[in-house]
Amino acid sequence: MAGILRLPDHGRLIVCTDLQGCLRDYDQIVSIFQRHMRETGGDAHLLFTGDLVHGPHIDPNDWPDFLGEFYRDESGELMRKFARLRAANPKHVHAIIGNHEHGHIGGPHTAKFAADEVELLESRLGPDQTAWLRALLRELPLCAIAPCGAVFTHGAPAADIGSIGEVEKARLDGLHFDSPVDIFDVPVVGPLLWARSAHTQVARRFLRAMGGTIAIYGHDVIPEGFERIGDEQIVVSTSFGVFDSNKVYLELDLAGHYKTVYDLRVGQEIRPLYPDKAPRSLGGNAG
């Protein structure tokens, strides 16, 4: 079963999207989380919204601007560090599954930066580490919810559901595809892992079923850092495909309540990953 992560009604929540093997950005968000753990006496949480793995293998001279800041894929080391961090902070470090992780445990294999990114990463890891990675990924839930009204998915909230039980009962394994595009026909799992947009009415029905008011997700790249869609949806780009100056993460008050995504304010809930590089329009210190 896919499962749902239920966050508490107290503390701070740091939200990071789409690292895709960028270890430098992972280390930066972890340092932010650790600072909040110290400031709150341990009442902080860190949530990754999927796609921690599968980055580019491109030389600097061939790097295109549309991929944002240059980096080299370090998916294996990133996942090892995530596992150690989660073990050191039980019930405080979380991740939900993204479409790139899903490929390792039954989903279609992605081919963004290689003919088969699943095969490439697993060949680099070797048999033992591959078995370890698959076991880790099978533990990840499909969605996360919080009493503050936030519902977290990897892709857009485009699953047309009537109850939270439909998400809880969704299967991530045992799927068979004649073509990778067949995933779009899989109820619940297909749209929540692959959709880049959701019609307003579908998003509202999804949020009602999940008991939330706002949907927070990544998956798509927003070069400006984030995009609000109506009152219910916000797409956040913390890492992949974005230059350092525009990378943002979220800092939420789990004891609060967010009625619309416009309750998420730049410089408060919406924060720059690298403040010294970010413009003031994103809450940064640069001119």
Model-found features: residue ranges?
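Beta-strand-turn-beta hairpins that frame and shape the catalytic cleft
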Residues: 5-14, 145-151, 231
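Active-site neighborhood of divalent metal-dependent phosphoester bond hydrolases
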Residues: 42-43, 52-150, 158
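Active-site neighborhood of phospho(di)ester-bond hydrolases with catalytic His/Asp-centered motifs
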Residues: 15-17, 46-51, 94-99, 152-153, ...
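A short C-terminal boundary segment appended to hydrolase-like catalytic domains
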Residues: 268-287
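Active-site environment of divalent metal-dependent phosphoester hydrolases
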Residues: 22-24, 54-57, 100-106, 158-160, ...
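Active-site-proximal loop/helix segment associated with metal-binding centers of metalloenzymes
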Residues: 111-129, 134-210, 243
